[in-house]
């Protein structure tokens, strides 16, 4: 909570001024019954029309001031709330971009989305409520009680006797609500995850006719959310009816006592009228307090979830440069890594990738190919062993320092709802000519020129208005744009036909002196021309050498080659 509400500090003076204006408006509102009592007791009895008009005008003035001050204060509160939530969402989003990959995996993408949207919305609503009613309600409550005590202690004490019951009710339910709304937000995360998976894989779902299966998955998540929402709503919705019961009981008791006191001349009707007005104001204040506690329950759960992200320390940090050095672009020594800390996903891998060379990584599904690439990009740090990047330990670099040297195209990278040029440039200072050069190298020039607006053609989100091969070629163009020193193609040509794949490899060989290339593939044809090839199986290196050497020494590589291209081709 403290971390989240520290974002209000820059607005403290505006909030203080807003609170002051709100105090003035509330005081003006509290004075209305006092003026009314004076009119009923004194002015009406005097039968002086001028006095009636003057005191009536004074009531209108107080009412107008109360309205004006509240409007101004509420507008100031809206400005603070808008700027507060904007800054909070911005920093939360920036933090999600800098989370380590393992931390992102731990939070999950749907949960992070929910925290940026739903949770910040709950906190925003509470900040707005606390500015609008956080001062007004206590002043109405305390001021009303003080004035009623001065007017008629006996009636006031009856009213005050109800308040402890109300406060106990609100406090108990709000504490319970924090836990219940925490469960609701967790259920929202689960539902969002199912939605993301279903919408992202809608083509696969339709192709395999798995609509019923996904409906069942959604129904389970939806029922869990509904159950938790029902529990939270049932508890929190009980607040207002029970409060109304207590307040109405208090009003009934006050009315009965007032009738007795008026009959005995211990009080007068004018005082009772004013007293009932104050009782109404106090009731409104108590209802506002109850609403604030309900919103606090949601806000507290949401603020805790937001703080978890904002307070997460970076695990992958720049460390003091190690003494090991290398003349190669990348050197991997005895590298081991595990996602879950149990079974090793990579086990004792050692490779060398010289400057200007081409390096291939091949293996079956789950062999550790993409995991090795993630370690080379420092998405994760290895459990043991060492990676040297440009002659120095990779731990001596931040990810931001590695990024300018690397162009990466993954198999399932994302294309944005922007023009082709913007997708290839991706925020970098790259000329239009360089964009065309990248498209030509990626074998994408012809189809881009054939698009209705060429480079200015706007793509659908995810590039869904392109074929799979066209999307991959644009992703490769993005990776090679600007000629980065290291190009990593992580199964990035899997959707290309053999002819286009061969043309791409030929184009990359022509600029081999400008870039070091790492190609991850399941096709032997995609890596056969590489200077060195690493064969992975279940996280272990089972082959390392040239294409010809591996055909002789590595049964797994030979099996892949034979199954894909025919053994006679290589004999």
Model-assigned labels for residue ranges:
Residues 1-10, 112:
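A short amphipathic helical element positioned immediately N-terminal to and/or at the very start
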Residues 9-13, 77, 98-102, 118-131, ...:
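An intracellular "coupling" helix at the cytosolic face of ABC transporter transmembrane type-1 domains
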Residues 15-72, 76, 149-154, 265-269:
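Transmembrane helix-loop-helix hairpins at lipid-water interfaces of multipass membrane proteins
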Residues 20, 24, 28-32, 69, ...:
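Hydrophobic alpha-helical transmembrane segments of ABC transporter permease domains
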Residues 47-53, 147-164, 231-305, 309-310:
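Helix-loop-helix
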Residues 199-203, 279-341, 381-384, 388, ...:
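ABC transporter TMD-NBD coupling linker
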Residues 325-571:
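ABC-type nucleotide-binding domain
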